[in-house]
Swiss-Prot record:
Name of this chain's protein: Ribosome-binding factor A
Its biological purpose: One of several proteins that assist in the late maturation steps of the functional core of the 30S ribosomal subunit. Associates with free 30S ribosomal subunits (but not with 30S subunits that are part of 70S ribosomes or polysomes). Required for efficient processing of 16S rRNA. May interact with the 5'-terminal helix region of 16S rRNA.
MF term (GO), any: ribosomal small subunit binding
Location in the cell: Cytoplasm
Subunit and partners: Monomer. Binds 30S ribosomal subunits, but not 50S ribosomal subunits or 70S ribosomes.
Highest taxon in the source lineage: Bacteria
HAMAP family: RbfA
BP GO terms, sorted: maturation of SSU-rRNA
PROSITE patterns the record matches: RBFA (PS01319)
Biased composition (Low complexity): 124-136
Gene: rbfA
GO CC list: cytosol
Origin species: Corynebacterium urealyticum (strain ATCC 43042 / DSM 7109)
Length: 143
């Protein structure tokens, strides 16, 4: 069993190797908008999960995640060979690609927070103009 520090170092190195390989060595146009965001290794250093995001060609265009996933799946063997050539380890880890949903989740959270702020501001504006129901002093005074 490898220590966690070694697994973390190897994961970081695999992330760099895969990112550079996708950018420079793999000639698949479907991978043009793929970004490698994170890599995690198992404790035995035999499997690496590579997390990726996909962006659209423009800001308004939706990313084609299934197309990018298919491209990564077809390039998996070539990427593993590149990783094996550049890592000096006895066993080259198998690569599995996982779509990273953190950017979409954080964008959704930001949207929800913006809606909550807008509702808070509306309540604050309504409270500033509100007058108490009934008399100004709601408590009965004894004479």
């Amino acid at each position: 069993m490898a220590d966690n520090a070694r697994a973390a170092r190897m994961a970081k190195r695999i992330q760099q190797i895969v990112a550079v390989a996708i950018e420079r060595e793999i000639k698949d146009p479907r991978l043009e908008y793929v970004t490698i965001t994170d890599t995690r290794m198992t404790g035995d250093l035999h499997d690496a999960s590579v997390f990726y995001t996909v962006r659209g060609a423009s800001i308004d265009e939706e990313p084609d995640v299934p197309l990018a996933a298919a491209a990564l799946e077809s390039a998996k063997g070539q990427l593993r060979k590149i990783v094996g050539d550049q890592l000096s380890v006895r066993f080259t880890p198998t690569l599995s690609f996982v779509h990273d949903t953190v950017p979409e989740a954080s964008a959704h959270m930001e949207k929800l927070l913006a809606e909550a702020r807008a509702k808070d501001e509306a309540v604050r504006a309504q409270a500033a103009q509100a007058k108490p129901a009934g008399e100004a002093n709601p408590y009965k005074e004894r004479n």
